[in-house]
Amino acid sequence: MYRRLDGDVFSKRPTVLNVTFGMNDTGYAEYNQPGAGEFGERRYRECYENYGRMEQRLQGLDGVRVVLLGGAPYDETAQIEKNAPLRGKNAVLQRVVDFQRASAGENGWEFLDFNTPLTELSQRVQADDPSFTLTMGDRIHPDNDGHMVMAYLYLKAQGMAGKKVADVRI
């Protein structure tokens, strides 16, 4: 992420940056192996340290609106056949969201958390339907409903609540 900032981001001279990370950075299958707790802690620390370098670069931007996005959750609570959850992964992701929130506050940047509301919504529905998920069944990638909830949260945070945001005709 950090190494690609110049070519993929700054070279485009953005006026608004939406920054999110964490799902890939926090690892996968290792959460179901011996030493998972230590693995999660190591991945969290790496993520935190790498973000610190990126934060310094973001602080140096003039005239750029920075929005940190607490990423979508890893759904480890849905009962999905033939897809064992990676226990503890979302807790590590939530810690990443916590330091993103703190960084946004310290730097005067905007912050929007997708993880907490999507997790809460999923768990509320899972109380009646344990197989419910806002992912495509892989526990990672939001499905259409998950993306719709994220779009709602994003637009609401941008002051668009109650306003027309699209006009679609077929």
Regions found by a protein language model. Name each.
Residues Y2-M148, Y152-I170:
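Alpha-helical cap/lid subdomain in secreted, periplasmic
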